[in-house]
A protein has these predicted regions:
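Short S/T/G/P-rich N-terminal loop/turn motif that feeds into the first structured element of a domain
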Residues: 2-94, 100-115, 131-186
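Conserved short beta-strand edge segments in small beta-sheet-based binding/regulatory domains
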Residues: 118-133
Length: 186
């Protein structure tokens, strides 16, 4: 859903209830989380399987190389940003997956399963405790894992709220075209 007329021009913040939504609206796999000034997203925190830290770090390099070889690889996910963090606060190593994207929670998860199954690139989640072995053929189990490990934010802010990644790229292409045009006029 694109930003409405000039909705993007005024920064916006949204305080979100503890549950992660304002009213229960059922999606395919559970409650629908709201679109916020930062679009859609989730923060998943899960314990890392013993001895898998190096595999997770290496997987970051795999994704980097895959994107270098095929820049549009993750395009079906309609991502703005991904951030991965490993941390230990005394209870074992944990992994945090933060994603900001333009689709709802359930669609993002379904698209991720499809993308990883078709591309042959697996998911980093295979290194996490409790992640289902049959994730490629059992979307319900994949979604259950993601929802069980989702920690909803309670505040989201957007400097340019509700703007999709496609709208941002379009604006940047337009800016580049204008710059090129002005350079030609010199």
């Amino acid at each position: 859903m694109p930003a409405t007329d000039h909705q993007w021009s005024k920064p916006a913040a949204m305080a979100i209830p503890k549950e992660g939504y304002f009213e229960v609206q059922r999606g395919r796999y559970g409650p629908v989380f709201p679109r916020t000034p930062a679009c859609y997203g989730f923060s998943i925190i899960a314990k890392v399987k013993p001895g898998r830290e190096d595999a997770i770090r290496e997987y970051g390099k795999v994704i980097e190389a895959a994107i270098e070889a095929q820049p549009e690889l993750l395009a079906p996910l309609r991502l703005h940003y991904l951030r991965w963090v490993l941390f230990d606060v005394g209870f074992g190593l944990h992994f945090q997956y933060q994603g900001i994207f333009d689709t709802d929670f359930d669609k993002y998860t379904e698209d991720a399963i499809k993308l990883f199954t078709q591309s042959g690139v697996t998911t980093v989640f295979t290194n996490l405790e409790g992640f289902p072995d049959d994730w490629q053929t059992n979307p319900e189990a994949f979604v259950k894992f993601v929802r069980d490990h989702q920690f909803p934010s309670f505040l989201e802010y957007g400097e340019y709220p509700y703007v999709t990644a496609d709208e941002i790229k379009k604006a940047l292409r337009l800016k580049a075209a204008f710059s090129d045009m002005l350079d030609q006029m010199r």
